[in-house]
Design a protein with these regions (language model features):
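Residue-level detector of anion-binding/catalytic polar loops
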Residues: 275, 340, 403
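Catalytic or ion-translocation cores adjacent to nucleophile or general acid/base/metal-coordination motifs
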Residues: 205-226, 233, 242-244, 249-252, ...
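Long, compositionally biased, glycine/small-hydrophobic-enriched stretches that function as flexible linkers
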Residues: 1-196, 202-210, 376-526, 530-543, ...
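Active-site-proximal segments of catalytic enzyme domains
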Residues: 196-201, 224-238, 555-556
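Active-site/ligand-binding-proximal alpha/beta "capping" segment
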Residues: 320-348, 355
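Solvent-exposed alpha-helices and their adjacent loops that cap or buttress functional pockets
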Residues: 150-151, 167-171, 176, 186-187, ...
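Small-residue-enriched alpha-helical segments and adjacent helix-cap loops
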Residues: 540, 544-575
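Glycine-rich beta-alpha junction loops
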Residues: 283, 325-328, 347-352, 408-414, ...
Length: 678
């Protein structure tokens, strides 16, 4: 297809003449058949809802087709409307658009649906089993047409994948406002999601899937590397060993998942210098990560894998080994063998336990997919039984000294609900969340989080230049940084200097870098200067994961190290999106769910297109200050020591910033007051 044909296809939106039906492509990884949850009346409503995108004369053709999709897949994806052109992020100039901001958003959307990047591209699922960009292909086509025709005096409003329309606004307003899964809190159960999604009225956007900010497994690999490295350091310190990279050699890290997010684990293990063994039940997902170079070896026989693990640990190899099979089989075999596991975690998609996020032991991948749709209650019982075995094997290894941490995927939450042995005597989880032990106190509380950028030229040389700019900025900041954050600065400088060697790019020319407010702002301003001077060939999109300092309220993950009782509140995430929207964000998003699951999390994010202009300089300075320090202020009010120090530093740097700081009360005074009775 020529670029001119591509542009015409975008501008056509939903075509007047329906394209021919598409064959179901079995070479692509597809979403599992969803639960048959709708009543007959609701199925009629779902069909009626789907047909409202099309003129009446097409209904007789589409109605039986959509009814068949609903019956066979549990959803109406409108496969017929899937475009013929290849799906990938193109250079910004190839998109038909009246403003650069809209063209950049189009590239970001297409990257989320790129088959190299997306988990279930034909079902518009980017990662996590149900992290959707859109609910159907009509929504995609209509959204792309709106973006192609909008001006800087309009804002596109997106309701859970549905483009509500273009509304008059102004140049400084966001070009797109996204919400995903914003249901009334009392209607936020797993079954509610299944029902609303099948009706076509809501979707689970995960984090960066529904907000057009996913950059492949690289998007989480820096955070995963930080976590694995610091978990290894904790283990070495506990053993009285110097926590050096050299001493990490031969340590064994075991986990599960080679999907869109979890696929970062083997690469993070190699970068950290440890031996990593990652289980993945889906053969297509395991092969995809192997073919992309994100895992070194692929094994499907535990009798062969176990001696390979022994050799890798003995020889202190920095190597990643994938086990294509059920993770419970792996854990139980490791527990039965005399193998020392140093670090353990889990990244199965347990936010979505009943619809493809977790596969029970004792059943093949295909058997499980059939059971979850045909016998959902039996499938639930099998998952619960599997989780009990899963946790028991982990417990045996933890008793031998393994450091296990929950990676915020609802593993401990769902295991506890299944009756697994994961609770301590006080009723709290036996194992920490990685945010409680590592990410929260060491990074989020000090303002460090997953800043990212995407070069809209899609030119690797532009990405290389941004790496160089970012490294130079961080070195300058490091020279004046206080002692308490120099360790983080050193790790981040090492990361960005090694980024190109680690072959992280899958899809668009993007980079992830943990940075604080000062680092993000100064890096972004230098990027904008480079665009202005012509050293960068095209605009750059700035963004971040929602899994950040301010972006997410999640009591079992991002805010699990908040101990003042406010971990279950969501003011921070909601306020963050509102504040970003009027400080210069090009688009903002607010989601229910993400990470731990639907009904368990509120999170949000932004995207900002910088083009070398003075307006972009202003937006960078105003918006990034708020986007980071909102969360630091909240964390400092929760009496988190590092956050109090960080917000004090920011107030010294920014005279207009005035934050309410906590006063500490003496514990003995509190106890005495409560003991006194009138």
């Amino acid at each position: 297809m020529t670029n001119e044909e591509f542009r015409r296809d975008i501008l056509a939106g939903i075509p007047d003449n329906l394209p021919e039906p598409r064959e179901y492509d079995r070479s692509v990884n597809h979403a599992p058949r969803r639960k048959d949850i709708l009543s007959e009346a609701e199925k009629e409503l779902a069909l009626k809802n789907a047909l409202r995108y099309f003129p009446e004369h097409q209904h007789s053709t589409l109605a039986p087709e959509f009814a068949r999709e609903l019956r066979e897949y549990g959803r109406i994806y409108m496969y017929r409307l899937r475009p013929d052109y290849p799906m990938y992020a193109r250079p910004i100039g190839e998109y038909p658009a009246k403003c650069k901001q809209a063209a950049a958003i189009m590239a970001m959307i297409q990257n989320n649906l790129d088959p190299r990047v997306a988990q279930h591209p034909h079902e518009l699922i980017t990662y996590g089993g149900n992290g959707a960009v859109f609910q159907n292909w009509a929504q995609y086509r209509l959204t792309m047409k709106y973006l192609a025709t909008m001006t800087e005096q309009q804002t596109l409003v997106m309701y859970s994948g549905h483009p509500l329309g273009l509304f008059p606004s102004h140049k400084d307003a966001p070009r797109v406002i996204v919400t995903n899964g914003m249901v009334i809190p009392n209607y936020s159960s797993q079954d509610n999601w299944e029902r609303f999604n099948a009706l076509g009225v809501s979707q689970y956007g995960q984090m960066t899937a529904g907000s057009y900010m996913y950059i492949g497994p690289q998007g989480i690999v820096h955070g995963t590397t930080i976590t694995v490295m610091n978990a290894a350091r904790k283990q070495l310190k506990a053993r009285g060993i110097e926590p050096s990279r050299e001493n990490m050699g031969g340590m064994l890290f075991v986990s599960a998942g080679l999907g869109g997010m979890s696929g970062a684990q083997p690469k993070a293990g190699v970068i950290s210098g440890v031996v990593s063994v990652i289980a993945e039940i889906n053969p297509l997902a395991a092969r995809k990560r192997y073919d992309q170079g994100w895992v070194d070896e692929l094994h499907d026989d535990l009798d062969e894998l176990i001696p390979r693990i022994r050799k890798a640990c003995r020889d202190k190899e920095a190597v990643s080994l994938a086990y294509q099979g059920n993770v419970v089989d792996l854990w139980e075999r490791l527990a039965a063998e005399d193998i020392k596991v140093d670090l353990g975690s889990d990244q199965t998609s347990l936010h979505n336990p009943w619809a493809g996020g977790y596969y029970p032991v004792g059943y093949s991948y295909e058997e499980s997919r059939e059971m979850m749709a045909a016998e959902p209650e039996r499938f639930r019982e099998c998952v619960r039984a599997s989780l009990r075995r899963h946790a028991a094997a982990i417990g045996r290894l933890a008793d031998r000294g393994m450091y296990f941490f929950d990676y915020g995927n609802a593993f401990l939450l769902e295991a506890s609900r299944a009756g697994a042995d994961v609770l301590a005597a006080d009723g709290k989880f036996r194992y920490p969340s990685y945010v409680q032990d590592i990410m929260g106190p060491m990074f989020f509380d000090s303002g460090f989080g997953p800043f990212r950028w995407v070069c809209m030229s899609q030119d690797p040389s532009d990405l290389a230049l941004t790496d160089e700019i970012a490294a130079n900025v961080l070195k300058e900041i490091r020279a004046e940084a206080p002692e308490e954050i120099r360790g983080q600065m050193d790790d981040n400088i090492h990361w960005i200097e090694e980024a190109s060697r680690n072959n992280l790019v899958v899809g668009s020319q993007a980079r992830i870098l943990y940075a604080d407010c000062e680092g993000r702002t100064k890096i972004a301003l230098e990027f904008n200067k480079a665009i202005r001077e012509g050293r960068l060939k095209a605009p750059v999109v700035l963004g971040r994961d929602h899994h950040d300092v301010s972006g997410t309220d999640s009591p079992y993950r991002e805010t699990s190290n908040i101990y003042d009782g406010s971990a279950f509140t969501a003011d921070m995430a909601v306020q963050n999106v509102i504040g970003d929207s009027f400080r210069g964000a090009t688009w903002v998003s607010l989601h229910n769910g993400g990470g731990v699951g639907w009904g368990e999390v509120i999170n949000g994010g932004f995207g900002m297109v910088i083009d070398g202009s003075e307006d972009a300089d202003r937006h960078i300075s105003e918006m990034l200050l708020w986007d980071v320090n909102n969360g630091i202020a909240r964390r400092s009010w929760a009496r988190n020591e590092a956050a109090v120090k960080a917000i004090r530093r920011e107030m010294e740097r920014t005279p207009l910033l005035q934050v309410t700081l906590p006063n500490e009360a003496d514990n003995s005074l509190i106890k005495k007051a409560l003991e006194h009775k009138d």
